């Protein structure tokens, strides 16, 4: 414990969501899960002071790190100057165009102990590059991992889980307590693995329509489908799809959402805005 982040004099910045990992056991466990190989294209988001980066570099793979805090990039360059396969880019990962870091032939393995305040929009941003991604390993607030991996009927089930599971196989790997970080966050964290499908197993006709249906359905999660989806689909149409209009959205699985989205795409209601 405490091996990293010492003697560097960097004050953790709350606005950048800086909670630095300092538990070597947790770092090793994450890297063992990733199992990086020397010919791989590893991309780390938010390397911080390089606790994970160092172990990734030891695998021999190339590591490109995307870090927003301009005070950290020189520290990282100095720390890893012995590793020619290390590169740090000073950029906001939320706006960064990841197409410059990978090709379909050399996809990225995305890794990050992500800033918790931006993790949901960042995951949606990263999903847009899924064709260039082999897999993703993220440390997130446990509550967000629960939402990503949630199944129908669970409290955590909602838009994030449905859309992530549409594009990716989602696996919650293990939990990490606050004491593994400096400063310690207030909440528990967890590691999630997202593996994008080459082709979604339940492909819908139009993802924009699926997104609209899912967003609308969960906008009022305590209401029944006949209410939440009334601007998109009629009760008769829901019944024709073998979906009970009286149930709440949290009971619908991905196949039902895809069925509704395909119907809505083929039969747009006139009052749809
Ligand atoms: C939770 S810390 C993790 C640091 C390090 N990976 C570790 O495990 O100790 C999050 C890191 O993401 C960086 N960060 C915050 N917002 C960012 C953004 N929009 N784009 C890229 N990096 C960001 C922070 O400066 C910080 O280094």
Curated annotation (Swiss-Prot):
Top EC class for this record: transferase
Catalytic activity, EC: 2.1.1.182
Entry's transmembrane regions: none
Reactions it catalyzes: adenosine(1518)/adenosine(1519) in 16S rRNA + 4 S-adenosyl-L-methionine = N(6)-dimethyladenosine(1518)/N(6)-dimethyladenosine(1519) in 16S rRNA + 4 S-adenosyl-L-homocysteine + 4 H(+)
Source organism, top-level taxon: Bacteria
GO terms for cellular component: cytosol
Sample GO molecular function, one term: RNA binding
UniProt cross-references to InterPro entries, sorted A to Z: KsgA/Erm (IPR001737), rRNA_Ade_diMease-like_C (IPR023165), rRNA_Ade_Mease_Trfase_CS (IPR020596), rRNA_Ade_methylase_Trfase_N (IPR020598), rRNA_adenine_dimethylase (IPR011530), SAM-dependent_MTases_sf (IPR029063)
Main location per the UniProt record: cytoplasm
Binding-site positions, S-adenosyl-L-methionine: 19, 21, 46, 67, 92, 113
Metal-binding listed as a keyword: no
Localization, UniProt: Cytoplasm
Keywords: Cytoplasm, Methyltransferase, RNA-binding, rRNA processing, S-adenosyl-L-methionine, Transferase
PANTHER family: DIMETHYLADENOSINE TRANSFERASE, DIMETHYLADENOSINE TRANSFERASE-RELATED
NCBIfam families documented for this protein: ksgA
Purpose of the protein: Specifically dimethylates two adjacent adenosines (A1518 and A1519) in the loop of a conserved hairpin near the 3'-end of 16S rRNA in the 30S particle. May play a critical role in biogenesis of 30S subunits.
Family membership noted in the UniProt record: Belongs to the class I-like SAM-binding methyltransferase superfamily. rRNA adenine N(6)-methyltransferase family. RsmA subfamily.
Protein name: Ribosomal RNA small subunit methyltransferase A
Organism: Hahella chejuensis (strain KCTC 2396)
């Amino acid at each position: 414990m405490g091996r990293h982040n010492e003697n560097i004099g960097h004050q953790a910045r709350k606005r950048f969501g800086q909670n630095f990992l300092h538990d070597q056991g947790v770092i090793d466990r994450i890297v063992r899960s990733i199992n990086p190989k020397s010919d791989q294209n590893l991309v780390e988001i938010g390397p911080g002071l390089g606790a994970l980066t160092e172990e990734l570099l030891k695998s021999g793979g190339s590591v490109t790190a995307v870090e927003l805090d301009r005070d950290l990039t020189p520290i990282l360059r100095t720390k890893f100057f012995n590793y020619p396969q290390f590169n740090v880019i000073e950029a906001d990962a939320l706006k960064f165009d990841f197409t410059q870091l990978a090709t379909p032939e050399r996809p990225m393995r995305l890794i990050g102990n992500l800033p918790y305040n931006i993790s949901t929009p960042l995951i949606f941003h990263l999903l847009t590059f899924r064709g260039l991604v082999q897999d993703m390993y993220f440390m997130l607030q446990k509550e967000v991992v629960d939402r990503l991996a949630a199944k129908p009927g669970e409290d955590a089930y909602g838009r994030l889980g449905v859309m992530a599971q549409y594009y990716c196989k989602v696996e919650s790997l293990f939990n990490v307590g606050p004491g593994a970080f400096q400063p310690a966050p207030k909440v528990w964290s967890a590691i999630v693995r997202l593996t994008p499908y080459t082709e979604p197993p339940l492909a819908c006709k139009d993802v924009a329509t699926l997104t609209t249906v899912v967003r609308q359905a969960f906008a009022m999660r305590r209401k029944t489908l006949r209410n939440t989806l009334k601007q998109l689909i009629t009760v008769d149409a829901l019944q024709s799809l073998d979906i009970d209009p009286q149930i709440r959205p949290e009971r619908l699985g991905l196949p039902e959402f895809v069925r509704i989205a395909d119907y809505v795409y083929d039969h747009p209601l006139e009052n749809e805005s």
